[in-house]
Amino acid sequence: MANVVENLGKLERRVTISLPKETVQKEIDARIQKLAKNVRMPGFRPGKVPLKMVAQQYAGQVEAEVLSDKIGQEFFTISRAENLRVAGQPSFAPKQEQSDDAYAFDATFEVYPEVKIGDLSTAEVERSTTTIGDAEIDRTLDILRKQRVHFHARGEAGEHGDGGADTAAQNGDRVTVDFVGKIDDVAFPGGTAEDFPFVLGEGRMLPEFEQAALGLKAGESRTFELKFPDDYHGKDVAGKTAQFTVTMKKVEWPHLPEIDAEFAKSLGIEDGDLAKMRNEIKENLEREAKRRTQAIVKNQVMDALLKISELDVPKALIEQDQQRLVEMARQDLAQRGVPNAKDAPIPAEMFAEQAERRVKLGLVLAELVKANGLEAKPEQIRAEVDEFAKSYEDPKEVVRWYYSNQQRLAEMEAFVVESNVVDFVLGKAKVTDKEVSFEALASASAQA
């Protein structure tokens, strides 16, 4: 007999599942007999409990298990027979009207939508490009020098000098201070510290605090007022005015290493050749620029695909992805050391919009890949693994690391598929190239 699939909406469907009671009862009896071989009850040896007593004890539980299994099996059979592409998990409910010879259940579920992708030639994508020159290399060298800064006491002679005759604290100096803060003459938590170090000009402290420390020499003190911002993270003091006294304990000036052979060696250039060092920095920056431009253009391509695509999104898939995002958020909290992160009360609703976009995009990409043969080829995956491995000290070990784990390899395969989609769309869309600086590129990729 043909199965009647009711259309309840755009994607929602319902089908009736009928299970002959005789068939169900046979399975219940078989399971109870099997269960009886191991059941333990007071006064009976294992396996010797009368079958009637086992049935009285476990019949309800076994019946529920059998019905659940049979319903699932029958639904699978029907969905295959009717070519139903079921999205998510179906829900089952007993029908109000039951016959004497069969159990009847309604299975309610959603199906995957038809995905209509519009004309790719109408899609508009802006592709960022950047050129790595001497200015970008010099800026990187400056950052690397600052990462290797050494501090020396002002006024004390050493191998790098004494930092000048002026021993007062200046911007860029590392200072060590004691401070006491009070509000209405009462000390408050976090308002007092001893031997507290920070670098002037880095913005770690509030502006009024840094300004008060500027110009002080070791042993000098200064009293000043400081108004905490209204949005200050310490709610007890936010918006309030405190009186601080800061005492300078130590003033140290920064010494940046010279860009010489020793500096190059510290960056891994064995012979200390400065030209090699600059060339390696350039190659690293170009790899980073490529990675960032790819990420930005990928987001633009995905946005463009969503704009020209028409489809209904199964609610079941959105709900599943919401739960997935909740678990990811909890894992992130756990990695940050938050106590009881796995039980954090994170509402799934906060991920509704993000989940809908992710599911919709996944359906569009699946359709595009299938229709245009954009699956990842083994040689493409290997090329991406090799490219990724180049930025590490031992590329061969990184390659082995990838190929030793199917999950890692699957992640790279997904990356290649996305790259294939991006290249395919760029070959058909209206693409505008835009030259941007490396700094602007970094800022844009951070916001993407």
From Swiss-Prot:
Q: Which class of enzymes does this protein belong to?
A: isomerase
Start and end residues of each PPIase FKBP-type domain:
172-257
Enzyme Commission (EC) number: 5.2.1.8
Annotated GO MF terms: peptidyl-prolyl cis-trans isomerase activity; protein folding chaperone; ribosome binding
Enumerate the Pfam families for this protein.
FKBP_C (PF00254), Trigger_C (PF05698), Trigger_N (PF05697)
Just give the chief location class: cytoplasm
The superkingdom of the source organism is: Bacteria
* Keywords in alphabetical order: Cell cycle, Cell division, Chaperone, Cytoplasm, Isomerase, Rotamase
Reaction(s) catalysed by this chain's protein: [protein]-peptidylproline (omega=180) = [protein]-peptidylproline (omega=0)
Give the domain note: Consists of 3 domains; the N-terminus binds the ribosome, the middle domain has PPIase activity, while the C-terminus has intrinsic chaperone activity on its own.
Family indicated by similarity: Belongs to the FKBP-type PPIase family. Tig subfamily.
HAMAP family found in the cross-reference section: Trigger_factor_Tig (MF_00303)
Q: What is this protein called?
A: Trigger factor
* Organism ancestry: Bacteria, Pseudomonadati, Pseudomonadota, Betaproteobacteria, Burkholderiales
